[in-house]
C-alpha cells in the first residue's frame, strides 16, 4: 500500500479544476465587485504604532456592520408599515445577529492594553465613536431621538440631512404602536401623533394594549411574536452597549473620551435607556 503522504496526488493538496475562471481581463472579479482596492487601502494610521491598525480596522468593520443594520431597519420599518410581519420577522433575526457580531468585535479590541493604546491615542485628536453617524442612525431608527446629538455632523451636510430626516420621522416603535391601533387596540392620540423628534416616553395606553396582546396571545399571535422579537433586538443592543462600556473601561479607565465626553460614565448612562419600555414593564403586570 502506498502511503498517501508520499503521493502528491493524494496528499495534503488541492489541485486547480479546469473549469475555474482565471482570466479577468474582460470580466468582473471578486475584488472588482467588492471594490477591495479601495476598501483595503482605506486604513491610514496617524502614527507608527503597530496596534493602531487593529484600532482602525475594528472600527471600520463595525461601521460596515452598522451600515447593514441601518439598511435592514429601514426595510423592517417599511415591512411593519405594510403589515408584512413575516418579512419583518426575518429582518429582525438578521439585525439581532448583526448586533451580536458587533458585540463580539469588542473582544478583539480588548486585546489592546492601556499601554498599547496610550502609544497612539493622541493621534486620534478629537475623533470619537460618539461621532459615528451609522450608530446614531440606528439609535434614531429605534427611537432614542435627540436633536442635540446631530450637531457634531453639521460639517457634513449629507449626513446631517439624513439624520435630520430620520429624527423627524416615526421610529420603528412608533410604527409598531400604529399597528396596535390599526388592529383595534385603543391607543391615546398623544402616543400616535407625538413629536417624533423627541425620545419616546412610556404611555399607559400602549402598556394596556400590550397587556391585552400578552393576555390573549393566541388571538394576537403576530403582535405577540413581534413584541418578543423587539425584545430580542433591545437585548442584543444592550449587550453591545455594555460590552462597549466595559471595553472602554478596560482600556482607558475613567479618563475623558477623545471626543470630550466623560468617557465610561457617559456610556453607562446609555444602559438605562429603553427603546420599548412598555414591553419590559408589562412583565410586572402579567
From Swiss-Prot:
> What InterPro entries is this protein classified in?
Trp/Indoleamine_2_3_dOase-like (IPR037217), Trp_2-3-dOase_bac (IPR017485), Trp_2_3_dOase (IPR004981)
Enzyme class comes to: oxidoreductase
Positions contributing to substrate binding: 55-59, 117, 121, 258
| Reactions accelerated catalytically | L-tryptophan + O2 = N-formyl-L-kynurenine
Q: Which UniProt keywords apply?
A: Dioxygenase, Heme, Iron, Metal-binding, Oxidoreductase, Tryptophan catabolism
Query: Which cofactors are reported in the record for this sequence?
Result: heme
Known EC number: 1.13.11.11
Q: Which domain of life is it from?
A: Bacteria
What remark does the entry make about the cofactor?
Binds 1 heme group per subunit.
Q: One GO BP annotation here?
A: L-tryptophan catabolic process to acetyl-CoA
**One of the Pfam families matching this protein, by short name:** Trp_dioxygenase
Q: Which terms in the Gene Ontology molecular function aspect does this entry carry?
A: heme binding; metal ion binding; tryptophan 2,3-dioxygenase activity
The pathway that the record names for this protein is:
Amino-acid degradation; L-tryptophan degradation via kynurenine pathway; L-kynurenine from L-tryptophan: step 1/2
Describe the family membership recorded for this protein in Swiss-Prot or TrEMBL.
Belongs to the tryptophan 2,3-dioxygenase family.
What PANTHER family has UniProt attached to this entry? Answer: TRYPTOPHAN 2,3-DIOXYGENASE
What is said about its interaction partners and assembly? Homotetramer.
**Known function:** Heme-dependent dioxygenase that catalyzes the oxidative cleavage of the L-tryptophan (L-Trp) pyrrole ring and converts L-tryptophan to N-formyl-L-kynurenine. Catalyzes the oxidative cleavage of the indole moiety.
Q: What is this protein called?
A: Tryptophan 2,3-dioxygenase
The organism named in the record is Shewanella woodyi (strain ATCC 51908 / MS32)
Amino acid at each position: 500500500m502506498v502511503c498517501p503522504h508520499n503521493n502528491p496526488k493524494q496528499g495534503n493538496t488541492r489541485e486547480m479544476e479546469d473549469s475555474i475562471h482565471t482570466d479577468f481581463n474582460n470580466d468582473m472579479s471578486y475584488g472588482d465587485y467588492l471594490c477591495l482596492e479601495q476598501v483595503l487601502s482605506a486604513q491610514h494610521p496617524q502614527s507608527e504604532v503597530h496596534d493602531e491598525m487593529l484600532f482602525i480596522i475594528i472600527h471600520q468593520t463595525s461601521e460596515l456592520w452598522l451600515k447593514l443594520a441601518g439598511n435592514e431597519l429601514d426595510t423592517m420599518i417599511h415591512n411593519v408599515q405594510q403589515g408584512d410581519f413575516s418579512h419583518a420577522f426575518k429582518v429582525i433575526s438578521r439585525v439581532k445577529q448583526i448586533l451580536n457580531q458587533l458585540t463580539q468585535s469588542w473582544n478583539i479590541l480588548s486585546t489592546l492594553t492601556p499601554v498599547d493604546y496610550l502609544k497612539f491615542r493622541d493621534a486620534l485628536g478629537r475623533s470619537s465613536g460618539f461621532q459615528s453617524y451609522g450608530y446614531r442612525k440606528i439609535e434614531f431608527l429605534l427611537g432614542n431621538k435627540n436633536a442635540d446629538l446631530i450637531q457634531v455632523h453639521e460639517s457634513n451636510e449629507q449626513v446631517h440631512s439624513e439624520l435630520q430626516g430620520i429624527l423627524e420621522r416615526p421610529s420603528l416603535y412608533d410604527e409598531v404602536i400604529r399597528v396596535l391601533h390599526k388592529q383595534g387596540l385603543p391607543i391615546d392620540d398623544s402616543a400616535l401623533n407625538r413629536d417624533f423628534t423627541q425620545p419616546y416616553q412610556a404611555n399607559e395606553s400602549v402598556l394596556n394594549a400590550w397587556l391585552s396582546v400578552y393576555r390573549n396571545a393566541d388571538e394576537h399571535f403576530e403582535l405577540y411574536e413581534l413584541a418578543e422579537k423587539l425584545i430580542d433586538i433591545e437585548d442584543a443592543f444592550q449587550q453591545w452597549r455594555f460590552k462597549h462600556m466595559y471595553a472602554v473601561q478596560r482600556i482607558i479607565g475613567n479618563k475623558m473620551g477623545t471626543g470630550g465626553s466623560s468617557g465610561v460614565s457617559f456610556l453607562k448612562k446609555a444602559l438605562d435607556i429603553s427603546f420599548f419600555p412598555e414591553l419590559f414593564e408589562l412583565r410586572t403586570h402579567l
